[in-house]
Amino acid sequence: MLSQWFRGRHLVVRSALFSRRRVSSESTSTKDDVIVDFEDPDLPLPEYPKRPDEPLETRKQRLMYQSRKRGMLENDLLLSTFAHKYLKDFNAEQTALYDDLINGVSNDWDIYYWATGVKQTPKEYDTEIMKLLKLHVDNAERVTRFRQPELTYYLKC
């Protein structure tokens, strides 16, 4: 028998084996939970406005800010370190692809799952920028990323 709880948009399913133990009301999540994410068709999400006349340097500065302020720590760390490392060297086309990636997706968890390989990346987002982000996430250099990089580095370049 399965017991189910709704938490926001996520459905957490726990087997009967784990539901027998006493769980406090504050902390009901365990590593054995299965999270099922589902789309809510009744929730209209506005499309991010395109900015075709925005100068490249202004766009890069906006993207640097948006990479740091995602609303979830996982993407804050991944995208801020990625932007810190690569954004200053992107050309206009690559910058537009990065803009589409971080602003075109309605759910930041999708970006996280695609970058970490948990979910398959849809064709429209499987670009050279996503491939570069996946390499960044693989972290072959074994760089520690416990905090976001300083903003002063980008401003000097």
From Swiss-Prot:
Coiled-coil zones: none
GO cellular component, one term: mitochondrion
Gene Ontology BP term (one): mitochondrial electron transport, succinate to ubiquinone
Range annotated as the organelle transit peptide: 1-22
Cell compartments where the protein resides: Mitochondrion matrix
Keyword Mitochondrion included in the entry's annotation: yes
Assembly notes: Interacts with the flavoprotein subunit within the SDH catalytic dimer.
Protein name: Succinate dehydrogenase assembly factor 2-B, mitochondrial
Species name: Drosophila mojavensis (Fruit fly)
